[in-house]
Structure formats: structure tokens, C-alpha cells
From Swiss-Prot:
<dbReference type="Pfam" id="PF01196">
    <property type="entry name" value="Ribosomal_L17"/>
</dbReference>
<comment type="similarity">
    <text>Belongs to the bacterial ribosomal protein bL17 family.</text>
</comment>
<dbReference type="InterPro" id="IPR036373">
    <property type="entry name" value="Ribosomal_bL17_sf"/>
</dbReference>
<protein>
    <recommendedName>
        <fullName>Large ribosomal subunit protein bL17</fullName>
    </recommendedName>
</protein>
<dbReference type="GO" id="GO:0006412">
    <property type="term" value="P:translation"/>
</dbReference>
<dbReference type="InterPro" id="IPR047859">
    <property type="entry name" value="Ribosomal_bL17_CS"/>
</dbReference>
<dbReference type="GO" id="GO:0003735">
    <property type="term" value="F:structural constituent of ribosome"/>
</dbReference>
<dbReference type="InterPro" id="IPR000456">
    <property type="entry name" value="Ribosomal_bL17"/>
</dbReference>
<keyword id="KW-0687">Ribonucleoprotein</keyword>
<keyword id="KW-0689">Ribosomal protein</keyword>
<dbReference type="GO" id="GO:0022625">
    <property type="term" value="C:cytosolic large ribosomal subunit"/>
</dbReference>
<comment type="subunit">
    <text>Part of the 50S ribosomal subunit. Contacts protein L32.</text>
</comment>
Amino acid sequence: MRHRKCGRKLNRNSSHLHAMLRNMAASLIINEVIKTTLPKAKELPRVVEPLITLAKHDNIANRRLVFAKIRSNEIVSKLFRELGPRFLNRTGGYTRILKCGFRAGDNAPMAYIEFVDRISANNSKDIN
């Protein structure tokens, strides 16, 4: 029986699923918005949000815990340098999922996942 088994399998074995979620988390941290299928987008905050919570307090232990999940020094440094201080006053809910229609090939539901306080190019004001 499947009682109390949390998370989605997404039609993959466990190593493929962990690798895919790790790569998607890295892409989300670098680009701050990605487009993916809706079930993958719903699964991604379970990976990303604990990393941002750790990045709020910059110490060597938290850096090592984040590095164990992401395995990239540049992503870890961006997480602790930019994203951690940005979300310092927010207690959770760092990501937002926006549905964006269906994929042309197989009609899969697609979604954008982004950070809530994302600084976009069209939001910035030109100061003269």
C-alpha cells in the first residue's frame, strides 16, 4: 500500500529523479525562473526552499549542507550572497508557480516557477 508516501515519482527511478531535481534546482537558482511541466514545478519547491532557508544564515556548516545537495560552488555562493539576504524577512514560500498553457507536442500542462521577489528586467526603473 502507498499510504503516507510523499512526493511524486514522475515516471523515473530514484537516482534519475534526484539528479533531475538537483539540476532543476540549480537552473532555478541561476536563472531565477524556469519553464517546466506542472508536476515537476510542484515538486521543485520541496528541494529549493530548504536550501534558501539554510542560505539565510551564512556559516560554514550551512554552506556544506547546501553544497551536499547542489554540488556547485558558484551556485552555492550565489545562494548565500544574493538569495539568502533577499529572503531574510520571509519565513517561507520563496517560490511561485504560474501555469502557462499546454505543450504543443504532447499537450502536457506547462508552468513557470520563479522566486517571489525576483528582480525582472521590466520592473527595474531607469534612474537619471
